UniProtKB/Swiss-Prot annotation:
Protein name as it appears in the record: DNA ligase
Enzyme class, broadest EC rank: ligase
A Pfam family reported for this protein in Swiss-Prot or TrEMBL: DNA_ligase_aden
The protein's required cofactors: Mg(2+); Mn(2+)
Active-site annotation: K150
Length: 768
């Protein structure tokens, strides 16, 4: 749906007797008929644009919206006097400008104080300051606070006069900003006319109780009542870009760059992309950028007696058709502030957009007035940040790491910088193409990002700070002289792939070490005590060259190593012996076949039932396995076509690695497993079963465990502290099980493998 024609919304509403005067009409309508029809079309299109952009609940098919939109365009072309500033046809218009007009804010756009303490004590300190300023005794009730997110975007002031958007301006220096009205009109979430209704009128006492729903305007005339809307209402908020929209935008930019389009570039982060779009001189370009908006406050107001609380004010703005973030709350005292800060901190990485903190505001507008301002900052509000997820630092060098499969990864060596709650000195550059695309050079000032548990990465270069003596553009092949930095083998870049690889295989010590660590990992052979430091010793000392040699280790060989005591050696030998009894799926996963992860290994084991059948399967036979495509099938076939790999497999079997016969399921049997074809999602903490144990039980019964909830999900298994997955399951009306319900499902399914999963109404179900 384009910003100029938001093409998604609902069955053609009741026309309220207004005749259709669109292009299909036999004769041009008179002015009075056209005016009535145009008013109805504006109202209807605004209503459905609100459903689509703000409520994410479209009702009108795209084609029907487009038909109504085109009819309005035709009327306005026929009678230009009927073209109003709030018409949906006016979202994208105007000429390319030479520059922006500076406008003065009627009420300054002041910034709020930032709490430098990012811990819980920062919230406690703010509450203590407010209570002190209000001279409250220690036994006074806790203060009510409105808590919100601190969006990482561009602050904007929207000026509505009698309910119609007439101007949009940036914050600028707080006193004056730039007029960006034409660009802001392209943002579908921002209403060109407010949905004002009598209950939002100037009489403060006519407002419904806080928390009640405000009455909304309805289609069938102009939305709301323009004569009831405030004479002036300035709405402050943030223009931002969602993460998924940002990724899609950058993907389009990369395609344009690949085509050779001049002047195109990718964007470093969503904030820069949003700010750049708002300040585009050509509104047609701004319209192509996927921008969003959240309202969070007011500027100048004339003709509206405000609600008594900040939360009530935001409710009113939402009822008037403005997008207001749902992640907000009214909390009590310091404890409430701390809880909100911690809750949002846990959600931060899963939000659809970037934030850099939360905002606390005294909820009572009367108390806000009492507290006032100090040095142009409100005493009644504060921004409480989280540790920054992006920081700037200097690139000291680029090293090349060799992975388990021979992949060569460029790694940035950085001046240490505190980002994402930890000190970072290394960050991935992913591959040569990414390093070149970002034009990363030694000596550059770079932007490093670390969010949650994500590996730190260099996301861009600050070109304005590039020194004159900066290094050359990165060329991996030239840098290495075409040879692996560990073993000296030739490197190659397979056609169609982004990664260079060492061709040395297990001859390469780096690949050998990574292959051993992979083989010994918990979800593979689970050899307890075989960690990276010990593997380094074993490989560097020449004790281990191949995987089968692990099972020739004895206490004497191990105790000969530095810092290896007899007890540790005995424990490791016992762990090696224990690992010999495994499953076919674990064994396949442990071999480190490219493209074969845990799920694929389990699918292969279920489908073929025996290792020899997997090793001898053709590419076509492999593609018959669920979720195995041509690339994965070719990778498996290539692995087992190598004599060395077959020899390793036979030596491991000869060393005593085995799996129980009953675990081998022929392809025909796989389809008859009790949960075959069923998809389950695990969320939260189960009382007795660990996540891995629950996953194993489900997969052993033929079910598939997915990481996300969708309409294709059959069951959601929810434990304590289940989050957004449980909420989505409820929205979709899916069957929700607790641990007891899961076990009952497995038992009942096993007793009757032909039972339809939806025919199990007696299974214990978690409360919804």
């Amino acid at each position: 749906m384009s910003p100029s024609a938001p093409a998604n919304s609902a069955p053609d509403p009741d026309r309220n007797g207004v005749p259709d005067v669109g292009p299909a009409s036999a004769a041009p309508p008179d002015l009075q008929t056209a005016a009535a029809r145009a008013a109805w079309l504006r109202s209807t299109l605004q209503h459905h644009a609100h459903l689509y952009y703000v409520l994410d609940a479209p009702e009108l098919p795209d084609a029907e919206y487009d038909r109504l939109f085109q009819e309005l365009q035709a009327i306005e072309a026929m009678y230009p006097a009927l073209r109003t500033a709030d018409s949906p046809t006016q979202r994208v218009l105007g000429q390319v400008r030479d520059g922006f007009v500076v406008v003065r804010h009627a009420v300054p756009m002041l910034s709020i104080r930032t709490e430098t303490d990012t811990e819980a004590s920062g919230a406690v300190a703010f509450d203590a300051r407010v209570r002190r300023e209000l001279e409250l005794p220690d036994d006074a009730p806790p203060i009510s606070y409105a808590t919100e997110l601190k969006f990482d975007g561009l602050a904007i002031n929207l000026r509505y006069e009698h309910g119609v958007l007439v101007q949009a301006a940036t914050r600028g220096d707080g006193e004056s900003g730039e007029d960006v009205t034409q660009n802001i009109r392209t943002i579908g979430q921002i209403p060109l006319r407010l949905r004002w209704a009598p209950t939002l009128g100037a009489d403060a006492h006519s407002l419904p109780p806080e928390g009640a729903r405000f009455a909304l305007g309805r289609p069938g005339g102009e939305t709301g009542a323009p004569d009831l809307a405030p004479a002036v209402l300035e709405v402050r908020g943030e223009v931002y870009m969602r993460r998924d929209d940002f990724e899609a935008l950058n993907e389009r930019q990369r395609e344009r760059i690949a085509r050779g389009d001049k002047g195109e570039k990718t964007f470093v982060n969503p904030r820069n992309a949003a700010a750049g779009a708002v300040r585009q001189l050509d509104p047609a370009i701004a319209a192509q950028r996927p921008l969003s908006f959240f309202a969070y406050g007011l500027g100048e107001v004339q003709g509206w007696a405000l609600p008594h609380t900040h939360a009530g004010l935001l409710d009113a703005l939402a009822a008037a058709g403005l997008p207001v973030c749902a992640e907000r709350a009214v909390v009590q005292g310091a404890d409430g502030l701390v809880a909100f800060h911690q809750r949002i901190g846990a959600l931060r990485d899963s939000l659809a957009f970037d934030i850099d903190g939360v905002v606390y505001k005294v909820d009572s507008l009367a108390l806000q007035q009492r507290l006032g301002f100090v040095t142009r900052e409100p005493r009644w509000a504060v921004a409480h940040k989280y540790p920054a997820q992006e920081q700037m630092t200097r690139l000291l060098g680029i090293e090349i790491q060799v992975g388990r499969t021979g992949k060569l990864t460029p790694v940035a060596r950085l001046e240490p910088v505190f980002v994402g709650g930890t000190t970072v000195s290394n960050a991935t550059l992913h591959n040569e193409d990414e390093a070149r695309r970002k034009d990363v050079r030694v000596g550059d000032t770079v932007i490093v990002r670390r969010a949650g548990d994500v590996i730190p990465q260099v996301v861009g270069v600050v070109l304005e700070q590039r020194p004159d003596d900066v290094g050359e553009p990165f060329d991996l092949y030239q840098r290495l002289g075409g040879r692996c930095p560990v073993c000296g083998s030739a490197i190659a870049r397979p056609e169609g792939e982004a990664d260079w690889r060492c061709t040395g295989g297990l001859f390469c010590a780096a690949q050998r070490k990574q292959a051993i660590l992979h083989f010994a990992s918990r979800r593979m052979m689970d050899i307890e005590g075989l960690g990276d430091k010990l593997v380094d010793q074993l490989v560097d000392a020449g004790v281990i060259r191949t995987l089968p040699e692990l099972y020739k280790l004895g206490v004497a060989k191990l105790t000969a190593l530095e810092r290896m005591g007899e007890k540790s050696a005995v424990n490791l030998v016992a762990a090696l012996e224990k690992s010999k009894q495994t499953t076919l799926a674990r064994f396949l996963f442990s071999l480190g076949i490219r493209q074969v992860g845990e799920a694929t290994a389990k699918a292969l084991a279920r489908h073929f039932g025996a290792l020899d059948r997997v090793m001898d399967a053709s590419v076509d036979q492999l593609q018959a396995v669920p979720d195995v495509g041509p690339i994965v099938a070719l990778s498996i076939r290539t692995f087992f076509d190598q004599p060395h790999n077959r020899e390793v497999v036979e030596q491991l079997r000869a060393a005593g690695i085995h799996w129980a016969e009953h675990e081998a399921s022929a392809a025909a049997d796989a389809a008859e497993l009790p949960l075959a074809g069923k998809t389950l999602v695990l969320t939260g903490t189960l009382p007795t079963l660990g996540r891995d144990a629950a996953k194993d039980l489900i997969e052993a019964a033929g079910g598939k465990v997915s990481g996300s909830v969708s309409k294709k999900t059959h069951f959601v298994v929810a434990g304590a502290e289940a989050g957004s997955k449980l909420d989505k399951a409820r929205e979709l009306g899916l069957v929700i099980l607790d641990e007891a319900g899961l076990l009952a499902l497995l038992n009942e399914a096993e007793a009757d493998a032909d039972a339809d999963a939806e025919g199990l109404p007696d299974s214990p179900v978690a409360p919804t």
